[in-house]
Amino acid sequence: MKHERLAVLFVFALPACSTTPPAPYDCAAPPTLSGVVRVDNPIPNRYIVVLKRAPGGPQIAASVAARFPQATNVTTFANALSGFSATMDASAAAAIARDSQVAYVQEEGRKTIGPPREGQSTQAAVPWGLDRIDQRELPLDRKYEPGATGAGVHSYTIDTGLDKNHPDFAGRVGEGFSVFGGEPIDGHGHGTHVTGTIAGTTWGVAKEATIHAVRVLDSEGSGTDSNVIRGVDWVTGHVRANGWPTVANMSLGGSVSPALDQAVCNSIAAGVTFAIAAGNDNLNACNYSPSRVKQALTLGACDERDSTARFSNTGGCIDLYGPGVDVESAARGGGSRVLSGTSMASPHAAGTAALCLARHPGPPDAVAACVVDNATPNTLNGVGSDTPNKLLYAKEP
């Protein structure tokens, strides 16, 4: 099981050309890295330091950082990654990479958001995406009856924040987090739309799940690897402290970032089931993070005619497809808007994972298997031979 470069909503740098076939990031057998790891379009003088030991508290990373006074603006990670991000020059990064407690130092990448491509509401009684995932075949029957609501499950949206006052979320918004301080208020709208698809009363798959907003992107939709890791880190600690059944959605991504992939893996190991957007470049999803994480659920996008979206990424890192073209969901400030992208497909899977958890509580591998094994096979048009032909299905078999 396995990002989204949101062709429609997120625009990230393309990965560098390589003759090496792209492969998933396997949490069970991660790559051995050392020295300074390069990324595409790095932020000057910004690095992420990953320690050799497992996550165990911020004091460990802080003690390592303290030995290098040339590292400034230090932010430590405690739960999903053992390490810290900091500002330093290349020589300091190389020196820290040689420290006996350091596994590797990674350049920090940048993420930027582009203008959304919007569609028009069909004013259907049931959004077509919900209608499609509770039946095996077309035509749509204008109903959504999945047989579960996701009650008792907690859903975390790692994104631009949330309009918590939208009536679609009334009474179900739990504690959130923002890397910018204060409440995770959505200044863009993307996170609100995504959350509406996961768990909104009107547009949501799991209509009674509890919602947690995790803001890692600013109001322009811009973020960094370290800010996204901070979000994953917070989710991991919050879930450990509370012990409740959890799904998380990441409708974001960019070029390969081993540190981010490692953080997602550690969060999965802590009990969080992740759904991740595959990306919208019509390229191989294994070239992006965190869509290449094998143990997460990575979603491509399809339309209401069961055709794959022309923008959707492809390849073996995709687990299955979900509705991602002209998807109606909650809008910041109230009402709804219609958007397209694998950003829209992924939350359908996060909601379906919440339904699986509500029916049969279990660890992330069992939840992911519930989602993938229950998918409708060989019903989509335009799927390449290197990509699974599976369509999300939300009902219990």
What spans do the regions from the language model cover?
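The feature captures the short pre-catalytic strand/loop hairpin that immediately precedes
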Residues: 303, 322-349, 378-379
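Structural recognition of the beta-strand scaffold that forms the well-ordered cores
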Residues: 48-50, 85, 154-157, 196, ...
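C-terminal motif of bacterial Sec signal peptides marking the signal peptidase cleavage site
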Residues: 14-16
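Active-site glycine-centered loops adjacent to acidic/histidine catalytic or metal-binding residues
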Residues: 159, 279, 341
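Protease zymogen maturation seam
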Residues: 18-40, 63-76, 81, 98-154, ...
